[in-house]
């Protein structure tokens, strides 16, 4: 805003001219009152400028968070910047396979509604109800310990897909309640906000459209998203650079909405698209598991740069070794008992995973639990 322009003709008096039919008359009018009015204008302009400057600074600060751009990954010091400093130009290669140059990857920074997917919309509306109307069961002062956010793997805790009950997943519900429902004997209270098939852009849209409302209070938010960002084998899969940037964008959105709240970033669960036994790696060929390892390594490094982020490594939960499959890394595989389709956990897989989550929550919440837990 420019300061008020004061006339250069600022002498002690000014001339007002009247032009009736009679001869022209010149009247000398003192300017003292006009000067006082201009001084008042100056004060008003200065005050307005200071107000707008302060307001702009406050609004700008709201969108500044601690982060690091893709180009700056690997630095040991925190960098103050904006999420807008994430640039698509930082992505060196969009496709998973190095020899593939064309793949249909969505913009990892752009929130996206799954238009035309009626059941997805209904599932989102159901999540809004859960997020806004979650009520403590024992005490009006008790807040949630953990809120799980993600895709079908997260939604599986509820035994549903797109909010619809799935019979073969009901054993998962029993596992969840035994660990994350204090009324059912669980050590902590948890809430699940996941939707099957979601990519990072879909979860970002959900978060920006009400799934983390102000009234939703939780000591910890637990994030698992990104495996669907790779796309399915044979569909020109997207690279780990694309996947990591999408997850990073969500993390920064959550840090903005919940500053000083602990956010646990769950590493991507292992998945197999190599062999019938659930093998993870293949000689002379880049697999999705290779990309998952790269994404998880970057997520861990990113979390180490932020005080309110914790990285959770899931690799040891679902992976076993069979020397008959090969040596070293080629002996690793996902047993069917833990992941029937080598992507989604079985009830046993959820049990093992959930018990490790409980251990992590104990570490995070140690000393923070109050009388409300009694």
Predicted regions and their residues:
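N-terminal secretory targeting modules
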Residues: 3-149, 153-174, 364-374
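A structural motif corresponding to the C-terminal end of an alpha-helix
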Residues: 185-187, 253-263, 298-312
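Conserved SGNH/GDSL esterase-like catalytic core that processes O-acyl groups on lipids
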Residues: 102-252, 256, 272, 277, ...
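Alpha/beta-hydrolase-fold catalytic nucleophile elbow
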Residues: 224, 264-267
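Residue-level recognition of beta-strand->loop/alpha-helix junctions
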Residues: 192-194, 267, 313
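Catalytic His-Asp segment of secreted/periplasmic serine-dependent ester chemistry enzymes
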Residues: 270-374
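Secondary-structure boundary/capping residues
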Residues: 212, 230, 263, 308-311, ...
